[in-house]
Amino acid sequence: MQFSGRTRKKLRLAGDQRNACYPHSLQFYLQPPTENISLTEFESLAFDRVKLLKAIENLGVSYVKGTEQYQSKLEAEIRKLKFSYRENLEDEYEPRRRDHISHFILRLAYCQSEDLRRWFIQQEMDLLRFRFSILPKDKVQSFLKDTHLHFEAISDEEKTLREQDIMASSPSLSGVRWESESVYKVPFADALDLFRGRKVYLEDGFAYVPLKDIVAIILNEFRATLSKALALTARSLPAVQSDERLQPLLSHLSHSYTGQDYSTQKSTGKISLDQIDSLSTKSFPPCMRQLHKALRENHHLRHGGRMQYGLFLKGIGLTLEQALQFWKQEFIKGKMDPDKFDKGYSYNIRHSFGKEGKRTDYTPFSCMKIILTNPPSQGDFHGCPFRHSDAELLKQKMQTYKIPASGISQILDLVKGNHYQVACQKYFEMTHNVDDCGFSLNHPNQFFFESQRILTGGKDIKKEASHPETPQHKPSTQKTKDATSALASLDSSLEMDLEGLEDYFSK
């Protein structure tokens, strides 16, 4: 598959050539990849990178960055997803290749809005910080050179000459063996953050920065480089979106869900309608608890609320017949004529179960879909309370849910940092009296099933393991066969020419 008029080429490298492509376990991603990959690998790499960045976000708010626990858990995530992380491991070509290609694929998806760019940059910075923290000291200078950062380590003589001044100006050197610490001579303009914090020694327009502090400068350079690159990529979006081979893969990537498929559960039919009120206070996430309360009080929900809540109920086990009965009973309480419900609303419910129209069996919305699409307006109750409620209203809601003041403060801090899913996870821990829930929350139905697992010991409602599914709707059998056949046909005859992608990242 070719994106430009460049001559196609496929890398066939071995030995030293392979190592030369990726000399380090970390990089600034200055050059786009130039090889061909299949559509299947393109998609697989993209979703693996999304999983990694979401894991980085969750770990970053659950643990102090740089601590032993944070480092070990992040290393485990990177290893599990087969990305590069250590400098001196053998057979690192493939993990570094995966890292390189997947980063550039996600640029295409995450350049589309300011919020997406900000989130992407932050997670990539945290990943770079981790990798730099475990980079051997003897590799730092070559990494800086390859990244075009002209920071030279000063000689031992210069260190000795300025030892007292540097030690007095650099708090990070407290308790560090001076003899083993490298110090870098950096232009003053590149060390402004350290200067503002009075954490660096200045002389003749240069800052003398210990290795422990150089990471702050490297991260600033990386942020500026990546921010500019994303802006350039955003200019090429119309061309990317017009490509029928790329557009389907990128359209939902930024808010895709990569976990459990909650469209069909073994618990189907095990939930009775008279259980819903009780379950809503015990096991519903705030977004669904809010919708249930609004439905009971107003006997009506607008379309966005009906879709979000209806698919959630379907995912926790309501059958089509139960769903029709549930919604009809509630809407009739609101003085709706039963015939009007049967002729209009019942069709939409059957449609969501794949029984009408295109026979698309819709799956419950993931957290990312709720957070990033269809924001609520006046009179709506759908959306994510942590994302779409102002701080005071959210505080009142948490008080109503009997969250202690200290817990509310933690939740509001997470929301202020745009960590909406982690805030919901903290709510889960508070309401279920657990210190660490042991999972990363990505789906309202995941919240429900994890809650039931704790409350019932997994005896009643138990989710079954299934393959991850990323779309928010499941096509009919025939459409699935057609799509699979089409993709197989594309894979057999065409490949992604990543060399041509350079045009999207540099124009």
Curated annotation (Swiss-Prot):
Residues 266-503 are annotated as: Interacts with PRIM1. This is DNA primase large subunit. Residues 461-486 are annotated as: Disordered. Binds 1 [4Fe-4S] cluster. It comes from Rattus norvegicus (Rat). It holds the Pfam family DNA_primase_lrg. Residues 461-472 have a biased composition (Basic and acidic residues). GO terms for cellular component: alpha DNA polymerase:primase complex. SUPFAM superfamilies: PriB N-terminal domain-like. The lineage of its organism: Eukaryota, Metazoa, Chordata, Craniata, Vertebrata. Its cofactor is [4Fe-4S] cluster. InterPro entries: DNA_primase_lsu_euk (IPR016558), DNA_primase_lsu_euk/arc (IPR007238). The keyword Transmembrane helix does not apply. It comes from the Eukaryota. Heterodimer of a catalytic subunit PRIM1 and a regulatory subunit PRIM2, also known as the DNA primase complex. Interacts via (C-terminus) with PRIM1. Component of the alpha DNA polymerase complex (also known as the alpha DNA polymerase-primase complex) consisting of four subunits: the catalytic subunit POLA1, the regulatory subunit POLA2, and the primase complex subunits PRIM1 and PRIM2 respectively. Within the complex, POLA1 directly interacts with PRIM2. GO terms for biological process: DNA replication; DNA replication initiation; DNA replication, synthesis of primer. Residues 253-270 are annotated as: Interdomain linker. The gene is Prim2. Belongs to the eukaryotic-type primase large subunit family. Keywords: 4Fe-4S, DNA replication, DNA-binding, Iron, Iron-sulfur, Metal-binding, Phosphoprotein, Primosome. Regulatory subunit of the DNA primase complex and component of the DNA polymerase alpha complex (also known as the alpha DNA polymerase-primase complex) which play an essential role in the initiation of DNA synthesis. During the S phase of the cell cycle, the DNA polymerase alpha complex (composed of a catalytic subunit POLA1, an accessory subunit POLA2 and two primase subunits, the catalytic subunit PRIM1 and the regulatory subunit PRIM2) is recruited to DNA at the replicative forks via direct interactions with MCM10 and WDHD1. The keyword Phosphoprotein applies. One of its GO terms (molecular function) is DNA-directed RNA polymerase activity.
